[in-house]
Amino acid sequence: MWTAWCVAALSVAAVCGIRQDTTTVLRVTKDVLGDAISGTIQKSDAFRSALREVPVGVGGVPYNDFHVREPPPKYTNGRQLGGNYKYGHIEANDNTAQLGGKYRYGEILDSDGSLRDLRHEDYRPSDSAYHRGPGRYRSAADPSSAGRLHRRELRPGEIPAGVATGALGPGGLLGTGGILANEGILAGQGGLLGGGGLLGDGGLLGGGGVLGVLGEGGILSTVQGITGLRIVELTLPRVSVRLLPGVGVYLSLYTRVAINGKSLIGFLDIAVEVNITAKVRLTMDRTGYPRLVIERCDTLLGGIKVKLLRGLLPNLVDNLVNRVLANVLPDLLCPIVDVVLGLVNDQLGLVDSLVPLGILGSVQYTFSSLPLVTGEFLELDLNTLVGEAGGDLIDYPLGRPAMLPRPQMPELPPMGDNTNSQLAISANFLSSVLTMLQKQGALDIDITDGMFEDLPPLTTSTLGALIPKVFQQYPESRPLTIRIQVPNPPTVTLQKDKALVKVFATSEVVVSQPNDVETTICLIDVDTDLLASFSVEGDKLMIDAKLDKTSLNLRTSNVGNFDVFILEMLVEKIFDLAFMPAMNAILGSGVPLPKILNIDFSNADIDVLEDLLVLST
């Protein structure tokens, strides 16, 4: 019931954006977060899972762009026979006219503006184009038009128009944009011999071509040039963290990777240094838990060493390996970082666990707001829920009017230069713990004669020596019972170097009659001031209280009025030697501290400040 209530309350507050009360604040530096990530990596199998075959050969989709995978485009950017082209066509769409303007495969521009299909020897005037079958002639200006001018006989010395205006003219065989001229099929950009053409730089047979195996951009320097990659060793990474104010963290993991593989020129042993970098945002999910989420992940390669077991050209292989690994390692290593951060997120979620508070209650820490990231520390605001064993929630301060606001969490002091973590516990939280003990009756105690050796005999004779009327009513010595009860919740006040606990108690003096009938002699109100000291054992805050002073007030008496001051020394001794040991025994179970990021507070420096108890490591 208690767990269900906490989860429900937390979920409602988180979804509705309600800021819960903060009773505990944890600050950690980047070193603590880095140690938590390193410890998670060492304890998990996340990095060992990378010892497997590396998937290559599909060109690789960047880890950060995995969501934009698309089918292959209809138009490619290969330049085997020109610029952009349709499969089965030679078509220039970028003003690089290999055979003139736009044309189909096998066509050439004639002097009259029509296109000749060179795949067929017979050609006839355009007026009969429609009778020659499809695809023989068409107009360059109008693809739907098939007409050509009728050819006439040439006079002696006359240059044919097809040569003057075609072969030598613009768009002709040798003219600007022609088949052999600049920008033509042989020399133009994207042409047969031009840049990106069949034989040109980057072309089919040129430098970087598919058959230029040893050239830059050849098959050896493509993903297909290396196969069978397998990661055989991955060292535990060296983790470094940089805080990004208002965002999260910048994570860097430096590791060494050993890879085996094969290339066209031999077997490979590859050793590479990898720096995995990730921008991580600190968010809060709908259930109120903080989450570290990768926004971008990259791998930076350095110090690549390639050993060829059989083969030549190591420099060429170095370049190939560098490109291949830069393409595939992000897909392999970045998901591992995501898994590691998921495990760290699980550690953050452990703070929400329900922890027993002795046998009488439990404590649960919940996140009250989105964590704060500054350039110096990460701050986590926690709300502490204290519950009774029966399931009721302790809502401190009890007994106060509901309209009175709770005291706000004070500002934390600056972190010291050598401080990595700082846990601030409010006086409200400590009061809630004592309130739970009070409601369970754990602070109530009955003290009888002989229970504590250091106390004087608790009899009517001892009391009668101080109050004569007691001796008169009970001339025969009878045993007494001192019944101490704490009807109201104690309060904790924290001041500079001083922790004060105020406990209001009632002390009822009861005499036991021979027939087991109990008679009350008097009822005294006792206001006590206790001085508290703190220590840490394991993952618990230990509280030890010491009696400082008492103040008595006689509420009722069955032996007449008397000056209660005469009982002050006796009552103070009873509280010091009986009540305080019993209370400290209850407090001895300790107060559970938040379990988060594997922080060890056992050797923490403890400072008592105004309304704050601060543990620093």
UniProtKB/Swiss-Prot annotation:
Signal sequence, start to end: 1-17
Family matches, as Gene3D superfamilies: Bactericidal permeability-increasing protein, domain 1, Bactericidal permeability-increasing protein, domain 2
InterPro entries to which the protein is assigned, alphabetical: Bactericidal_perm-incr_a/b_dom, BPI_fold-BPI/LBP, Lipid-bd_serum_glycop_C, Lipid-bd_serum_glycop_N
Compartments it resides in: Secreted; Cytoplasm
GO annotations of cellular component type: cytoplasm; extracellular region
Keywords associated with the record: Cytoplasm, Disulfide bond, Glycoprotein, Secreted, Signal
Residues listed as glycosylation sites in the UniProt record: 275
Domain of life, source organism: Eukaryota
Tissue: Highly expressed in olfactory mucosa but undetectable in thymus, kidney, lung, brain, spleen and liver.
Molecular function via GO: lipid binding
Keyword Secreted: yes
Region annotation (Disordered) ranges: 124-149
Disulfide-bonded cysteines: 297-334
Key word Secreted present: yes
Chief location: secreted
Functional summary from the UniProt entry: May have the capacity to recognize and bind specific classes of odorants. May act as a carrier molecule, transporting odorants across the mucus layer to access receptor sites. May serve as a primary defense mechanism by recognizing and removing potentially harmful odorants or pathogenic microorganisms from the mucosa or clearing excess odorant from mucus to enable new odorant stimuli to be received.
Protein family membership: Belongs to the BPI/LBP/Plunc superfamily. BPI/LBP family.
Protein name, UniProt field: BPI fold-containing family B member 4
Gene that this sequence comes from: Bpifb4
